[in-house]
């Protein structure tokens, strides 16, 4: 359990560090005088306190910088109104292309409409939106497949379980993952019971509070399915506090180094691993295909892989895939 405590403490410190760092970065970037030939691209993510989005951004940043261009980065901290304001601000600063992972797949629509009015192409990351006509290119993991893989592993472990689902109601990818999970369990014909679907925004602290409440409501929970690893870690903290972590199967999606270490120790059951490195590289490639008028794909789906204790050595625990 010591590994889990160190992992949780480190992630909580990261949330604070990233939040402070991104504010400083934003002020610095806006003050830079750019060469006239430099292209300026805007990027905004649900939250950069999630290492998944931080890794995607780092990969894009590296590619953009290597081309002598500039990436304006904004972190709305899971606030859609703030994200819309930041997008409008970047559009007014003259960005040539926008990369966005929306806080709310419906609520982001006004900002995307303004991008279209200004003729700024949009690359959507790890989500869908209410109006796909407002988006130039969409890059997502196989989110339905991620839920399906977690469900298949659960089916291989037990034919009967009481399950709670931790979701992010504003995220399209969250619903895809839970659809893949629940539909696969239903098709199995086994005795699986969904006790409750609880929205925690995919956030660590909210998931921890939600799990505390769920444990008070339900005397027995066999399985937790969390839509991302931040939510899974929050749930695991509550399960450990209650003394039932070792008897609860915990599934998630992401494939972070922290989660892989916990899987290696037998503390987390399995995760469907995304590849933020690959997503970031693909996004950067599409940026220049669009800006240079080259052919590009409008919909890119990146495969996911299941990671369990049985095959953790194949993936390692030292970094993202």
Where are these regions (language model features)?
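Extracytoplasmic "Venus flytrap"
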Residues: 40-59, 63, 67, 72-85, ...
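Flexible loop/hinge segments that line or gate small-molecule binding clefts
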Residues: 105-145, 156, 162, 256-264, ...
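Hinge/cleft segment of the Venus flytrap/periplasmic-binding protein
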Residues: 8-11, 21-30, 185, 278-321
